[in-house]
Amino acid sequence: MALWDIKGKMAGMPLYELFGGKVREGIPVYRHVDGRDINEICENIQMYQEMGITHLRCQCGGYGGLPYGQTPETAPEGAHDGLYLDSKKYIRDTIQLFEQIRAKIGYDMQLVHDVHERIAPADAVALAKGLEPFDLFFLEDPVPLEQLSWLRNLRQQTSIPIAQGELFNNPYEWRTVIAEQLIDFIRVHISQVGGITPARKLQIF
C-alpha cells in the first residue's frame, strides 16, 4: 500500500485516477449500532436515521455482541477465565433482537448482523433460517474459515444474503466461494489479503 501511495504522489494523482478514474459517485456504508438492550439499540438506530445512515450492523450488548449468549456458568471445569458462548442462547437472542427491531422501526433500514465465525456451521444454518423473516441486508461471517464448504449448505437451505471474507489471506480461500456463487458480498481487509494489488485482482476475479 505504501508503494502505491508513493507512485500516486510521484504522479501527482489520487489512486483512483491511476486505476482509470472513478466509476461511481458514492457507495453505501454501514455503521455499527449496539446497546445494552433492545430499547437502547432502537434509540441509537433512530439517531443514525436522522444522520442519513441507511445501513446498520446490529449487535446487542456491545461491540461483537457480548454478553449476548454469554453463559460463563457453563464454562468447563478448570477452563481459563473468559467468556463462553452458548450457541443456542445466542441464536434465540439474535432472532429475538431482529424481531423486536423490525417491530419497532419497520423495514426501511438495511440491517446487518455479524456472527464473527463464533458458532458451529449447523448452528449458522439454523440462525440464518431464523433471521429470514427480518430481511437482513446480509449475514456476515456465519462459518469459520476452516469450514467454508458449509457455505454450500447455507446457500441450499436459506435465502438470506451471505457476506464472508474478513479473515481471507490468499486466493485459494476466495476462488471457490466466488466461482460457485456461495456468497453475495465479499468482505476483506485490504491489509489482510496482501495490499492494494491483490485486492484489485480479487475485484476482477
State where each predicted segment sits.
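Secondary-structure boundary/capping positions in well-ordered alpha/beta enzyme cores
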Residues: P14, D108-M109, F134, P161, ...
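Ligand-binding pocket scaffold of soluble enzyme catalytic domains
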Residues: M10, P28, H32, F205
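Metal- or metallocofactor-binding catalytic centers and their adjacent structured scaffolds
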Residues: M1-M13
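Catalytic alpha/beta core domains of metabolic enzymes, predominantly
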Residues: E146, W150-L151, R155-F205
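Metal-dependent enolase-superfamily TIM-barrel catalytic cores that perform enediolate-based chemistry
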Residues: G26-I27, R31-Q157
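Anionic group-transfer/hydrolysis microenvironments
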Residues: K7, Q59, H116, P142-V143, ...
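Short, flexible active-site-proximal loops enriched in glycine and acidic residues
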Residues: M10-K22
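Alpha-helical scaffold segments in soluble metabolic enzymes
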Residues: D5-I6, E17, M47, Q100, ...
